Amino acid sequence: MLRWFRAFLPREERFFDLFARHSQTVVQGALALQDMLRGGDETPVFCQRVNQFENDADNITREVLTAVRRTFITPFDRVDIKNLITSMDDAIDQMQQTAKAVVLFEVRTFEPPMREIGTLLVECANLVGRALPLLQSIGDNVAMLTAITEELTKLEGRVDDLHDIGLKELFLKHRNANTMDFIVGAEIYDHLEKVADRFDDVANEINSIVIEQV
C-alpha cells in the first residue's frame, strides 16, 4: 500500500545527481588506482590522486545522508539509499587502503595479476556508473539492471581467481628469498580483492532495490 502511495507523490530527484557525482568519482578513483598499478616513479602521484578522489566521495556521501534525513519523499526506501551510497563509498575507501599500503611500503613495481585486477576494477566502476541512472525508472530497466549486477558478480569472481593466482606466483617467487616482499605483495592483493568485494556489495544493494520496487 505504501509503495503504491509513494508512486503518486513527487520525488526528490537530486539523489540521482548525487549518485552520478559519486559514481563518477569512484570511476576516477579506479582509473587512478589502475595508473598506480603500472608502477614507476609516478606511483606516489597516483596514490595521492586516489586519496583525493576518496575524500571527494566522502563529501558526496555526507550530502546524500543529509538529504535522506531532510527529504520527505525519497526515490526509494531511505535505508536502501543509505546502504547503496555506503557500499559505493566502501569501494573507494578500499582503493584508498590499497594506495596507503603502497605508500607505506614504498612499492614501485607490481605483478601482472595486480595490473589485471586494476583493469577489472575500472570495469566494475563503469558498470556501477551505468546502473545508477537506470534506477530512476526501475520497472523499465529490470533486465538491464539484472545484467549489470550479474556482470559485477562475474568480475568479482575473476578478481578472486587473479588474487589466488597472484598469491601462488608470489609464494613461488619469494619462498627462498625475501619473505617481506611476499608479505607486502599479499597485502596489496588482499586490498585489491576487497575493492572487488565492495563492488559486489553494490550489486547486491542494487538487486535489493529492484526487488523492493517491482
Q: Each predicted region: which residue ranges?
A:
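Cytosolic, long alpha-helical scaffolding segments
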Residues: 1-214
